[in-house]
Every structure is written in C-alpha cells, then in structure tokens.
Amino acid sequence: MIQGMTDTYPLLRILPEIIFTITGVVVMVLEPLFPKHASRKPLGWLTVLGALLALAASFYQYGLPIGTAYFGVVQTDAFSVFFHILISGIVLVSALVTIDAIKPDTENTGELFALMAFGAVGMLLMTCAAELLLVFIGLEISSIATYILAGFRRRSAKGPESAIKYFLLGSFATAFFLYGIALTYGATGTTNIPDIAAALLTSHALPLAVVGLSFILIGLAFKVSAAPFHLWTPDAYEGAPSPVVGLMSTAPKAAAFAVLLRIAYEAFPVFHFHWVPLLWIIAALSMTIGNLGALRQRNVKRMLAYSSIAHAGYLLVAFTALSPDGIAAASFYAVTYAAMNVGIFAVISHVGGYDDRLTLVEDYKGLAYRSPLLGGVMAFFLLSLIGIPFTGGFFGKFYVFSAAIHSGMIWLAIIGLINSGIAVFYYLRLLTATYSKPAESALVLTTGRPSFALLLALFLTVATTLLLGIFPGSVLARAQEGAYTFYRAPLVILGTHAGVFADPATAKSITSPTP
C-alpha cells in the first residue's frame, strides 16, 4: 500500500459498508414478501453473497493509497483493511451457520440476517474511523443490532432477560464512552484521532484528557468483555441463539479492539504511562476471572462466555507491549480467536439446535460416536483454544506472550501462561465428554445430517485455524503492515517528544518458532 492522502475515489474507501447496507435493506424489503411459513434461507444466502462481495471489496482496498475521505472522517490504511477482512469473514461464516440452524418454518428470521448485515456496517465504520464521533455512531449501530440479536428468541425465557441486561449495561458503558469523547474535546478542541495526539503536546488541560481517556477505555472494555466489565457476557451468550453467539463473541470484539488500538496508539501515545498500567491490570483480571469462572460452569455456552473473557485478557496482553510486535500480535490473535470461536459455536448450534435443546457438558457425551465429523471438529477447535502446536491458537498465544516478554512485561506473560494452563482443565472436560460413551440413563444425543451451509462454514473455520497454525507468515505480515500504520507521521513526531515509539526500521520483528 502506497502512502498518500488521495481522495479521488471516496466511495471505494467505504465500499464494504455500502455493500452490507444494501444487503440489509434488500433483505428487509424481501422478507415480508415471503409466505408466513416459507423458509427464509434464501435471505440467508443473499446475506452470504453480500458478505462475499464485502470481503472482495475489502481485499481490493489493499490497493488503495493510504488516505482519508469525507473531510478526514474515514481513514483507509492497512490496519483498517485488515479488520474489514476479518469482520466480513466472520459475518460470512455466521450467516452460513444461521442458515443451517434455523427451521424452515421459523418466522421473522429474515430480520436476523438483516441485523447481521447492519451490525457489520457499524463494526466496519468503527475500524476505519478517524473521528471519535464516527466511532460512536458505528458503535451504536453495531450495539443496537447485537442487543436485538441477543434477545431474538422471544419465546425463550432467558433470551429477553439477557437482552435487557445486555442493553442496560451496554447503555451505561456507551454513556462512559460518549462522556470520554466530550472531555477529550474539552481538553484538545478536536475529536479527530490524529489531531488529538498533536493537540496534547500543547494542551494545558492534560488532567481532563486523562479522565477522558479513562472513560473511553471503560466504554471499550465493556464491549470486549474485559473484567471487571464482563458481567453481561455469560447471561447474554446463554440467552442468545448459538449462531448469533458466534458472531457476538468475535466481530464486535474485533471492532472494539481495533478502535482501542487506534485510540491508544494514535491519539494518546503520550499517555502511555497512564493506560499501560490500567490495561495491565485489566488483562490480568480478565485472564484470571475468565478462566476461574469457566472452571465452575456446566453449561457449555456459559463456559465459553467466560473463556471469551479470558481471551480478551490475552489480547490485552499484547496492548501493553508498546511496539509494532504487540499490535501485530493482537491483530493476529483476533483472527485466530475468531476462527476458533465461530467454528466451535457452529458445532454447538447444530448439535443443540436453534432452541438450545442441549446445553450442558454432559449432553455432549457420545457426540464423536453419533457424528465423527462434528466430534472431530469440536476436538480440533478445543485443542486450538488450548494452544496445541500446529493450530492457530498456539501461534496466537506465542506471538502475544513473546511481544509482552520483549517489552519487559514478564510478569504479565507469566500470569497469561498460568491461566493458559488453567484453561486446559475445562476445555479437556468438554473434549472428554465428546469422546465418552453416554450412560444408559442419559439423554440420547441425536444430530441431524450437516447441511451444505454448515459443512462450508466448518471447512472455512477449520482451514483458517489450521493454516494459521502451519503457515502463519502471510497473515502475520499483513498484521505487521497494519501495525506500522501507527508509526507513520504524525506519530513519529510524537515518538521523538515522548519516547514512546521506536523507529520502525530498528524495531524487532516476531519470528515463528518451530513447533
């Protein structure tokens, strides 16, 4: 990607967002035209097509010059394009899983696919925003969509309850984020992310800016399910449809992490001595609370909800590195976690059904005997979540912890390694159940034949996780390209004043170990 500020084709800089918007509108228009009990699966395939086009448009954006559009509000660079591809891919696979999960006569599922598309628009806007107000707009678009998706099963007792809890706590976190933007504007006179960094060098209201940054971090910590702002996560995951949980647990987190990286490294690098200790504490709490909480769970979705809290902590470990390696490690881990989590929820969605007939770890006994394919895929994703070599999870954790160690965060890396050991126990508990013969008195586990949509979703997630574990170089190279986005002007100027950033030419690079 060539550096520049060309705005010759502004629409190309938001082409994936346009495609998802059109997809959502078309799905909403077509949905009422279907007979009451007709299958809405064609609308799901339409969403898959939209996600494919958005994915292709995102890859096309790699050929655009670095620059902004619409008066500096939208920014296209290697970092934003990397997360565009990730989020579009997550929506693609989630739509395939949903097509498999919904019953042919299920009503109103057209709205479910439309909400996926509209939520993707908000997440994509967050990742390419160069303006805090656009981040807020994208955050609200994605949040409203996920609130509704979380409570989409209206006949479920837990669905509406979890959605209301998610909405109330989410609104509270959004208020923190918005108030943080207001305080930042009061301290710097701007809400443009690159301009904030320059304004802080001459600002006389730095304490106000510190408070503003703290509020922004609190709002984003809620969105990524980081402790102690994680209380909504287990209930929301348990009450939402399983295909939706695969989307909820990955895409909004990826978007929020992208925003967190951009704000911390591009807008507030001079405050690294404030936000690094804060993120250190949040990372340690998230890993510990998430893994210890998962040990106590018998419900599979609640167990994976606590697991997602722990993985948010692993991602935050990379944030504290203050180096291109840390940013690249966080970006790589986001891809790895997305592939693993969407894949495992695809299996859970098919086994448990749209209505979650089977929810407990014991219910999965005999899965490998009833369906060797689903049992094998479940085992593969569990091993990857543990971090077994030749899986994406191994390299993801290796890059995160090595970045922390190289930056001197040795104790945080040790805490992460200890928590990775704790996680082995609850992942193996589900793995053991999958390959155990059920007792005669147990509920007979029945699984329907996987549909083409599910097989395609499983192939994409398994292949991605496997390739990331064997050939991580290409994805890591793209992640490093995005990381160096933050080391271009004007951040080089900030680096000379604050001593925060190293010269990209002399920065250490992550090297792949031999598994």
UniProtKB/Swiss-Prot annotation:
Is Transmembrane among this UniProt entry's keywords?
Answer: yes
Q: What is its EC number?
A: 7.1.1.-
* Spans through the membrane: 14-34, 46-66, 79-99, 110-130, 132-152, 167-187, 200-220, 241-261, 267-287, 303-323, 327-347, 375-395, 409-431, 452-472, 482-502
One Pfam family assigned to this protein is: Proton_antipo_M
- Superkingdom of origin: Bacteria
Where it sits in the cell: the answer is: Cell inner membrane
EC main class here is translocase
Question: What GO terms are given for molecular function?
Answer: NADH dehydrogenase (ubiquinone) activity; NADH:ubiquinone reductase (non-electrogenic) activity; quinone binding
- Statement: the UniProt record of this protein carries the keyword Cell inner membrane: yes
The Gene Ontology biological process terms listed for this entry are: ATP synthesis coupled electron transport
Q: What is the protein's major site of localization?
A: membrane
The record's catalysed reaction(s) read: a quinone + NADH + 5 H(+)(in) = a quinol + NAD(+) + 4 H(+)(out)
Per the record, membrane topology reads: Multi-pass membrane protein
Q: Which GO terms describe its cellular component?
A: plasma membrane
Key words of the record: Cell inner membrane, Cell membrane, Membrane, NAD, Quinone, Translocase, Transmembrane, Transmembrane helix, Transport, Ubiquinone
Task: Describe, as the record does, how this protein assembles with itself and its partners.
Answer: NDH-1 is composed of 14 different subunits. Subunits NuoA, H, J, K, L, M, N constitute the membrane sector of the complex.
Of which family is this protein a member? Belongs to the complex I subunit 2 family.
What is the protein's known function?
Answer: NDH-1 shuttles electrons from NADH, via FMN and iron-sulfur (Fe-S) centers, to quinones in the respiratory chain. The immediate electron acceptor for the enzyme in this species is believed to be ubiquinone. Couples the redox reaction to proton translocation (for every two electrons transferred, four hydrogen ions are translocated across the cytoplasmic membrane), and thus conserves the redox energy in a proton gradient.
Q: Which PANTHER family does the record match to this protein?
A: NADH DEHYDROGENASE (PTHR22773)
What name does UniProt use for this protein?
NADH-quinone oxidoreductase subunit N 1
